[in-house]
Amino acid sequence: MTRTILILLIGFLSSIVAGCSDTNLTHDIPLVPRPAQIVPGSGNYLFSGKTVFAVENEEQAEVARSFIALFTRAAGFTPKLTVGDAEKGNVRFQTDATLKSEAYTLQVSPKEIIIEASDAKGFFYALQTIRQLLPASIEKEEVSDKKVKWSIPAVSIQDEPRFGYRALLLDASRFFIPKENVL
């Protein structure tokens, strides 16, 4: 009797342990919404005052400036921005007309970051992904502690929207909101 219970207990515990082992490493990179494809790399890219954002045109520059402002405010340094020559930077914006609207490809290595998108929305969403990968101190309104490492993990990400629209759900059964407030 005790032998049967012991065998059942060992079988039960081993099935629990086997079910808990997950070789998928993508859960180590917390991103919302989950990108279509994530391939972790090795190492980290470190942002600093020497980081250069290289963009192809003024539309991309506008997107980059809003992201650079986060570093100015929270990190106390301002990465540089060059417009017109996307090959002369550590963070490079490259237009890829084959990608869908709002889609992007993000390749992060210890030496550089390459962002490919077909439009400004794609570059914006790629930078929002980078923003999530940065330490939470990037959201502060004042300069953070000097010990913060402004780095992101090396990773390759491909993403595109699953749907052609963005939506907002108003749960009118719980909160009665006047029409004027919604609009």
Which ranges hold each PLM region?
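A conserved hydrophobic secondary-structure block that centers on an alpha-helix together
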Residues: 171-183
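Hydrophobic faces of well-ordered beta-strands that scaffold small-molecule active sites
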Residues: 166-170
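Positively charged n-region of N-terminal signal peptides that target proteins for export
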Residues: 1-5
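Bacterial N-terminal signal peptides
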Residues: 7-16
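Acidic, contiguous N-terminal accessory segments
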Residues: 20-163
